Design a protein with these regions (language model features):
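ATP-binding glycine-rich phosphate-binding loop
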Residues: 1-41, 66-69
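Conserved end of the kinase activation segment
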Residues: 189-200
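Activation segment/activation loop of eukaryotic-type protein kinase catalytic domains
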Residues: 146-184, 188
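Conserved structural core of kinase catalytic domains
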Residues: 69-120
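Catalytic-loop of the protein kinase fold
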Residues: 132-154
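Conserved C-lobe activation region of Hanks-type protein kinase-like domains
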Residues: 201, 210-266
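Terminal C-lobe "cap" of eukaryotic-type protein kinase domains
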Residues: 276-302
């Protein structure tokens, strides 16, 4: 057993703290908090030992791509005075990576120096699907699969998964406890229940992440009520009721968000999405299926991707999603301008417009909240509004326009 010196880097989570390993730049150590009860620590020790002995075979990486770590996987135990304290894992270079969450909005990606196009997004989706498939082949599931726990190498587009000691293992030789879950990525059959089918849960979360990556961050269960049925305000409630508005067959109860570009997706991708969100646990697309379908679009020499007249990458035979999105943004700006003209010309008619807006035509929570404020302020004012009130309303709507433009961008 080798003695090492650990140096704190000031990063601590719910279960433990991360340290660098002196003279070992490729590795870091996670030390569990001393406050963890002994029974829980013993469970961690059994799990980490199993993981060290059963590392999954990961997707091959070209030899020219040095230093890419796809899993922060345990490689050795850390013992303190003959007692289990934590584990050593390979270090992910945070300087070369960014949170996958940043790819859900182009502005955040640009702030990270990453120029987003649909070729890169599809490649990230493909690499993530391959990685999840490797885990499932070893009967390991992430369960709490979500963008914030994923890193993307900016140049190579490979994906890394953090917090591997939180994975759920369901092999014949060892079964671990199911981890905590995030409601926005939780399959409908597991709401208010334990996750009894971890791979099915991963399949749902994987499809959700892929949909969001390809659709400018829009969640697959974000939509607009199409009738007067009770419509949950929380995404988890919509997931539980199966209110998915982006299928090839339209839903009678909910409409797609106007900012969505899902109709620009190829049929093969839309079919996997529909199966993942509408067909139940048994028919949900596997990580292997996703990897197979996405592989042709991720290839640089693929004829399944083409360029539009403006030079944007698009799916061959489909409309350009970037051009469609630009049109949506321009249309939104024009509608805001027309509303300001209407407001100044006839405040009473503008109130009617805002009331109608609040009943289901809003495309974002920012607009809805702003419209409610706007409605209250207009109702309290006389029909002939003072210059001060008009100026206040203009300021409010200008702020709303900026916020909404940022959200759509």
């Amino acid at each position: 057993m080798e003695k090492v010196r650990l140096l704190s880097i000031g990063k601590s989570g719910g279960a433990g703290e991360v340290f660098t390993v002196e003279d070992q730049p490729r590795y870091v150590a996670k030390i569990y908090h001393a406050s963890i009860r002994e029974s829980q620590r013993a469970q961690y020790a059994r799990k980490i030992r199993w993981m060290i002995d059963n590392k999954p075979e990961l997707p091959a990486i070209p030899t020219e791509y040095q230093g890419i770590v796809q899993l922060a996987w345990p490689v050795a135990l850390v013992m303190k005075q003959a007692s289990f304290a934590g584990f050593v894992m390979e270090k992910i270079d945070f300087g070369r990576t960014m949170e996958l969450d940043y790819l859900l909005t182009r502005r955040q990606a640009a702030d990270e120096g990453f120029d987003v196009d649909f070729g890169k997004l599809v490649t990230v989706c493909h690499n993530l699907a391959c990685l999840i498939d490797c885990l499932h082949s070893k009967r390991i599931a992430v369960v709490d699969l979500k963008p914030i726990n994923l890193k993307v190498y900016k140049s190579e587009l490979y994906v890394s998964i953090l917090d591997c000691d939180g994975f759920h293992i369901y092999s014949d030789s060892f079964v671990s406890e199911a981890p905590q879950v995030t409601p926005e990525y939780l399959a409908p059959e597991f709401h208010e229940k334990a996750v009894t089918q971890p791979e099915a849960q991963d399949r749902f979360a994987l499809a959700t992440i892929i949909f969001r990556l390809l659709n400018y961050g829009i969640h697959p269960f974000a939509g607009i009520a199409a009738n007067r049925i009770p419509y949950p305000t929380e995404l988890s409630g919509r997931i539980k009721l199966g209110l998915y508005p982006y299928g090839k067959l339209p839903s009678a109860n909910v409409r797609a968000t106007p900012a969505s570009v899902h109709e620009c997706f190829p049929d093969s991708i839309r079919e996997l999405l529909d199966r993942s969100f509408t067909s139940g646990t048994g028919a949900r697309a596997s990580a292997y299926e996703w990897a197979a379908v996405l592989s042709s679009f991720a290839s640089k020499s693929s004829a399944d991707m083409s360029r539009c007249q403006k030079g944007h990458l698009q799916f061959a035979g489909k409309s350009c999603p970037c051009c469609l999105r630009e049109g949506i943004l321009r249309g939104h700006v024009e509608r805001q301008k027309r509303f300001m003209v209407r407001l100044q010309a006839s405040p009473a008619r503008a109130v009617t417009y805002v009331k109608k807006t609040l009943k289901g035509t809003q495309t974002s929570p920012f607009q809805a909240a702003l419209a409610q404020v706007q409605l209250n302020s207009v109702q309290l004012a006389p029909v002939t509004m003072s210059i001060r009130n008009v100026a206040s309303i203009e300021i409010l709507w200008t702020i709303g326009l900026i916020i909404t433009f940022w959200w759509l961008k």
